[in-house]
Amino acid sequence: MIDNFGKNNGLTLDTCFVIQAYKNPAITSFYLQKGFYGCKIFINEIVLNEAEHLGFDKAKLLFTMQKIFGRVIVKDVTNEERLFGQHLEKLCPILHSGDSAILAFTKRTSTTLVTLDKNLGKACDFFNTHCIVLEITKKRGLTV
């Protein structure tokens, strides 16, 4: 796991994390273990749209996230964030448009990104952005 904690304003959840938490809420155990209980939880429109594109129902995903975390704040990604994301893609070729917009949102909100995507974690590290990269293994379960 990569975690570069510091002062943060909550957590931004990535698409892969939201989908896995929907399927298996136990992976959210880091939330209590790392002392994040009660912090702001953000899900942005990019995450919801990507999940919907993969066949998930946005309302069901949000309902499940609210059951797990309590209040969940849903935000749009601004045009400025999208443009900033495109700039980030040019600097870090492992990013694609969805991830770059999520990363730009995370940077703007000064939150900690929660993901299962190792490449997105590397991009966060490259751009000095707080992140938690979780790993799920068959043998050990969740690695935080």
What residue spans do the PLM features occupy?
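Acidic, PIN/NYN-like endoribonuclease modules and their adjacent C-terminal/linker elements
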Residues: M1-N8, I43, R108-V114, K118-V144
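PIN/NYN-family metal-dependent endoribonuclease catalytic core
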Residues: G10-L13, K23, S29-K60, Q66-F69, ...
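Short His-Asn-centered micro-motif
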Residues: L13-T15, Q20, T115-D117
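Short, flexible loop segments at the rims of nucleotide/cofactor-binding pockets, characterized by
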Residues: V18-A21, E52, E89-P93
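Short active-site loop/helix that positions an aromatic residue
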Residues: A21-N24, D125
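A short acidic, often aromatic-flanked loop/helix-cap motif at beta-alpha or helix-coil junctions
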Residues: E50, T78-F84, T137-T143
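Short, hinge-like loop/turn segments at secondary-structure boundaries
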Residues: K58-L62, P93, C131-V133
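Active-site neighborhoods of divalent-metal-dependent phosphate/nucleic-acid chemistry enzymes
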Residues: V74-F126
